[in-house]
Amino acid sequence: MSTGESEGEQAERMAFILGLRQRGIRDVGVLRAMELVPRPLFVDPALRRHAYDDVALPIACGQTMSQPSLVAAMTEALSLTADHSVLEVGTGSGYHAAVLSHLAARVVTVDRYRSLVAEAQARFEVLGLRNVTAYVGDGTLGMPARAPFDRILVTAAAPDIPFALIDQLKFGGVIVMPLGAPEEIQTLVRYVKEQSGRTRTELMKVRFVPLIPGAAATL
């Protein structure tokens, strides 16, 4: 893999990882995965000086790229192992899926915007990520053709977890998703599907774009 990083850029990335540790990220695997993925590749060229800042950044189609500490916290909450299959709903820039690809056996990511999917897939190819595939589709329906999944990550908010996602989750599996109204502060939850029922743990307050049904007619 060649990302064309200078020594200064490599040093910036090391400082970025140190910053994540200082913000409470402890999972060594998550930190290593985020070290391996060059975040500037996923950021608009005009904003690349902010690529390693802990802020959310705008991307195309009116979407956003979550701040790195939130990406790390959500990834930690998934409790991934190397044999897991993961569904991500909301590809966006592809950054989070790229991070997940270093922690799981297989990553399937779906977004309603064709242009975002095409750009993300191109970035995966640049990085040589062969275990992650992006699809255009309705994220509320999951990806039944590739189910079941050990873990599901949703990067857009809804009042509740779509039934299709619960249905495509293996028993013992985990969903991490923001719940709440799009115009309000939401709650990031960790849902565990069990034979005897389910458990749902509130993790933190967050703010995400809404989860919109259907694939976009344009863009």
From Swiss-Prot:
Keywords: Cytoplasm, Methyltransferase, S-adenosyl-L-methionine, Transferase. The keyword S-adenosyl-L-methionine applies. GO terms for cellular component: cytoplasm. The keyword Zinc-finger does not apply. This is Protein-L-isoaspartate O-methyltransferase. Its EC number is 2.1.1.77. Catalyzes the methyl esterification of L-isoaspartyl residues in peptides and proteins that result from spontaneous decomposition of normal L-aspartyl and L-asparaginyl residues. It plays a role in the repair and/or degradation of damaged proteins. It catalyses: [protein]-L-isoaspartate + S-adenosyl-L-methionine = [protein]-L-isoaspartate alpha-methyl ester + S-adenosyl-L-homocysteine. It is an enzyme of class 2 (transferase). One of its GO terms (biological process) is protein modification process. It comes from Xanthobacter autotrophicus (strain ATCC BAA-1158 / Py2). GO terms for molecular function: protein-L-isoaspartate (D-aspartate) O-methyltransferase activity. It is found in: Cytoplasm. The active site is at residue 66. Belongs to the methyltransferase superfamily. L-isoaspartyl/D-aspartyl protein methyltransferase family.
